[in-house]
Amino acid sequence: MPKADIHPTWYPDAKVTCNGEVIMTVGSTKPEINVEIWSGNHPFYTGTQKIIDTEGRVDRFMRKYGMKEKTTGDKQDKKKK
């Protein structure tokens, strides 16, 4: 026999709300649950996700430290003159 008065109150129809709108009902120990993001307004699930085009790490390193591909040798010709 379980002990009396040690278990939390169970709410079988607890309301889950997002921005004041009731999204669903679940069983919980709280009568109301407020969430900021759920699958109905998350960009990944709604298809409004922005894909950021980032350059590769190697390209970024090469650009940052000036290690570009060798050219035809224009700089060497100027130094010899």
Swiss-Prot record:
Q: Name one GO biological process term.
A: translation
Coiled-coil regions listed in the entry: none
One Pfam family assigned to this protein is Ribosomal_L31
Q: Which UniProt keywords apply?
A: Ribonucleoprotein, Ribosomal protein, RNA-binding, rRNA-binding
Which GO CC terms are listed, alphabetically?
ribonucleoprotein complex; ribosome
Q: Which SUPFAM superfamilies match?
A: L28p-like
Question: What's a Gene Ontology MF term here?
Answer: structural constituent of ribosome
Write down the InterPro entries for this protein, in alphabetical order: Ribosomal_bL28/bL31-like_sf, Ribosomal_bL31, Ribosomal_bL31_A, Ribosomal_bL31_sf
Give the family, as the similarity comment puts it: Belongs to the bacterial ribosomal protein bL31 family. Type A subfamily.
- Its biological purpose: Binds the 23S rRNA.
Q: How does it assemble?
A: Part of the 50S ribosomal subunit.
NCBIfam families on file: L31 (TIGR00105), PRK00019.1 (NF000612), PRK00528.1 (NF001809)
What is the protein name for this chain? Answer: Large ribosomal subunit protein bL31
Organism annotation: Synechocystis sp. (strain ATCC 27184 / PCC 6803 / Kazusa)
